[in-house]
A protein has these predicted regions:
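Acidic, polar-rich N-terminal leader regions of halophilic archaeal proteins
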Residues: 1-92
């Protein structure tokens, strides 16, 4: 199966957009960390597994609850991209 991680790259970009819109510095730092984590997933030879993607989804949702306005929309888009990628991962 081809390994197209474009959805993960899009998710990282959306997390960056959410970070730029975040009013709280701590939340912005968490978004930056999440974006970096997603980028690392795009650069490793091994595909992320369902467990990693589930934890990532949980962490994005947790931060999303602390956002408002455009930042919420960007975080929601990031979640959609992670879910789309997860559908391509074999297993569970």
């Amino acid at each position: 199966m081809p390994d197209d991680r474009s959805d993960l790259r899009e998710a990282a970009d959306e997390l960056d957009a959410a970070r730029e819109e975040a009013a709280d510095a701590e939340v912005a730092d968490r978004l930056e960390s999440l974006a970096e984590r997603v980028r690392e997933m795009t650069e490793t030879q091994r595909r992320p597994d369902h467990g990693q993607l589930d934890r990532l989804t949980h962490d994005i949702r947790e931060v999303e609850a602390q956002l408002d306005g455009e930042a919420v929309a960007a975080a929601g888009s990031a979640l959609a991209h992670v879910r789309a990628y997860r559908e391509t991962v074999e297993g569970v």
